[in-house]
A protein has these predicted regions:
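Non-catalytic, alpha-helical, charged scaffold/linker segments
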Residues: 51-93, 232-340
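Active-site loops and adjacent core secondary-structure elements that bind or stabilize anionic groups
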Residues: 8-9
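Extended, H/D-rich, highly charged conserved domains that either
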Residues: 299, 304-336, 363-468
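Conserved beta-sheet core of the metallophosphoesterase superfamily
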Residues: 186-192, 196-199, 214-227, 406-416, ...
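Low-complexity, serine/threonine/proline-enriched polar segments
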Residues: 62-113, 237-262, 422-480
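Low-complexity, highly charged intrinsically disordered N-terminal segments
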Residues: 79-160
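Active-site environment of divalent metal-dependent phosphoester hydrolases
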Residues: 27-28, 179-182, 204-209, 513, ...
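Single conserved hydrophobic/aromatic residue that forms the stacking wall/gate
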Residues: 1-5, 569-576
């Protein structure tokens, strides 16, 4: 009977807060700041607790201390004349906040979250009432002892970190940790040590998973994207990928080539590179791009069932005249220097290119940090998740024009809806974990690349990825990528209801939660669609998208009061 009663007590507790983030794209500072403040949940708690008993500036001070305790303590010490008095007041305030954020959880769960060094003391403080005079005196004795023994700083830091942890019960990353930004490896380090989280893989995550599995076309794409945005930190410092062979090859091959169209987008670079280094990055960018097109052609030829023959474009170049011939029309090329391409056999890798990609392949396969992070992605991730009447997936659900599920052939079978996401999930795992040398492994490896750019891939769902056209052709119409029907039909409530039913998610409070497509506020777009059945929360963390969206994106918080959509604004530094 006592066990039943205990279960009922746990069930009757307020709902733990869920935090949804998506499309972080390597922006680790913004990511860590949003984690620290729980998208405003900490501020809301502080306002609830102290109300009008504190001035706004005082409440802001408490919040800043909770977010960045080490930094804030240094500022306080330089300012305060009576530090012990500040310690006494602040520790009492932090105890109240900690009591509030821990009240949703059982004592057992809270105890498991406590820092070992201060576990007993924090338990005493959390479970004593400050209203009763005797208890209030007891709390003050504990706090005074902390101060007199010179442990106040350490204790404040421990309390602030505990508040951060208890404010969020579970974290959902709805895809795209990787790409563009300089700190995907730092984000993964944070997640590997996070107390409760899950990941719904995004297209950029899958690309990195393909690279870590040994797909050379994925490896080339990963490097190309890094060069495009001059973000080499994740590759070199994060994962120890040796780019020296690529640098040497690029300098030799394109020594007299300005490679103008391959100049990186410096607005989003991870450092201030000098002219010589930028020149080298530009050459490396061109070298790996040409290699990528050749490697992708190998997969396209090997897998005609992918239906991607129209993405083999090098053979449509008239190298003598410097034009691209497509569907009877000619387009002048923006770059006509191709020293590694044989016009008679344009997709054949030169001996030097093959040797280069073999070296880079080995570097990816031997990176221990990359292996650790990929294991984390596989352990805590998947193509979709159903949680508390919410269906989470990063990008798309392939649909026909009439809203029915699109049947996608994989191997000898067709898959659609939930079955399609389950099958692609299984293939991504097979590509990484299965032994080399089997046809199953070989097909899965190729399919991971298809998940990056294939027309019927739920992580992509466009008619093409116009990489070649964007680089070499100045025609916007030719570079246009047409999205699948999902991206327009998802505005209809009946379509969203059909998708939810496919995953056995029912009820008036069920939702689909997506990322992938930035919500362009400045163009009047809304994150809430289909009469509230679909929420698009592309985090907009990526600085590359912020000029287009007008904001730094959205996050979502789901607490005992309901769903709360949080608007993020840009800032020179999150700490500001």
């Amino acid at each position: 009977a006592s066990l039943v009663g205990s279960e009922m007590c746990i069930r009757d507790r307020p709902k733990g807060t869920e935090h949804f983030l998506t499309d972080i794209h390597g922006e680790y500072e913004a990511f860590q700041h949003v984690l620290k403040n729980a998208s405003g949940a900490v501020k809301r708690k502080v306002n609830e607790i102290f109300g009008n008993t504190l001035r706004e500036a005082e409440k802001k001070e408490i919040c800043t201390l909770i977010y960045y305790p080490e930094e804030k303590l240094q500022l306080v010490k330089a300012r305060e004349k009576d530090l012990d008095d500040w310690y006494l007041i602040t520790l009492n305030q932090l105890v109240k906040v900690c009591q509030n954020v821990s009240s949703k959880y059982t004592r057992s769960k809270v105890r498991k979250s406590l820092p070992a060094e201060f576990s007993y003391i924090i338990q005493e403080l959390l479970h004593e009432s400050s209203i009763e005079p005797n208890k209030h005196a007891y709390i003050n004795v504990i706090i005074s002892t902390i101060i007199t023994t010179k442990r106040a700083d350490d204790f404040i830091i421990a309390m602030c970190n505990l508040i951060q942890r208890l404010t969020i019960d579970s974290l959902h990353i709805v895809g795209d940790i990787y790409d563009r930004g300089p700190g995907a490896h730092i984000i993964m380090d944070t997640l590997c040590n996070y107390h409760n989280f899950d990941i719904q893989w995004g297209n950029h995550d899958i690309l990195w998973m393909g690279a870590a599995s040994g797909n050379d076309a994925c490896i080339a794409n990963v490097i190309r994207m890094s060069m495009r945005y001059a973000n080499l930190v994740t590759l070199e410092d994060g994962y120890g990928i040796n780019l020296l062979p690529l640098a040497t090859f690029a300098m030799d091959t394109y020594a007299d080539d300005p490679c103008t169209i391959f100049a990186p987008k410096m607005n989003f670079a991870d450092g201030n590179y000098n002219e010589k280094t930028l020149r080298l990055i530009t050459q490396m960018h061109k070298a790996i791009t040409v290699i990528q097109f050749k490697l992708e052609a190998e997969i396209i030829d090997r897998r005609p069932e992918f239906g991607m023959q129209n993405r083999k474009l090098l053979d449509k170049i008239d190298f003598e005249r410097g034009v691209f011939v497509y569907e009877g029309k000619e387009y002048p090329l923006r770059d006509t220097n191709f020293p590694t391409i044989d016009p008679a056999d344009p997709y054949r890798l030169s001996d030097e290119e093959r040797e280069l990609i073999d070296k880079i392949h080995a570097s990816f396969m031997n990176s221990e940090k990359l292996k650790k992070h990929m294991r984390c992605l596989f352990t805590y991730g998947g193509m979709y998740l159903v949680c508390n009447s919410n269906l989470l997936y990063h990008a798309s659900m392939p649909l026909n024009e009439d809203g029915s599920f699109k049947h996608v052939r994989i191997g000898k079978k067709e898959y659609w809806g939930r079955k399609l996401l389950c099958k692609t999930d299984q293939l991504i795992r097979t590509a990484y974990f299965d032994e080399d040398g089997t046809e199953e492994k070989s097909f899965a490896l190729d399919y991971v690349w298809y998940m990056w750019c294939g027309p019927n891939a739920p992580s992509f769902d466009k008619d093409k990825m116009a990489t070649f056209e964007r680089y070499f052709i100045g025609d916007k119409e030719l570079s246009k990528e047409t999205k699948g029907y999902y991206y327009t039909l998802r505005n209809r409530a009946d379509i969203c209801e059909r998708i939810l039913a496919e995953f056995e998610v029912t009820g008036p409070h069920s939702h689909i939660i997506n990322g992938h497509v930035p919500v362009k506020i400045i163009k009047g777009e809304k994150p809430i669609k289909a009469d509230g059945k679909l929420l698009v929360i592309d985090g907009g963390f990526s600085k590359a998208y912020q000029p287009e969206t007008g904001i730094a994106g959205y996050t979502l918080v789901y607490h005992s009061h309901g769903l709360q959509l949080c608007l993020l604004y840009t800032s020179p530094s999150p700490r500001d």
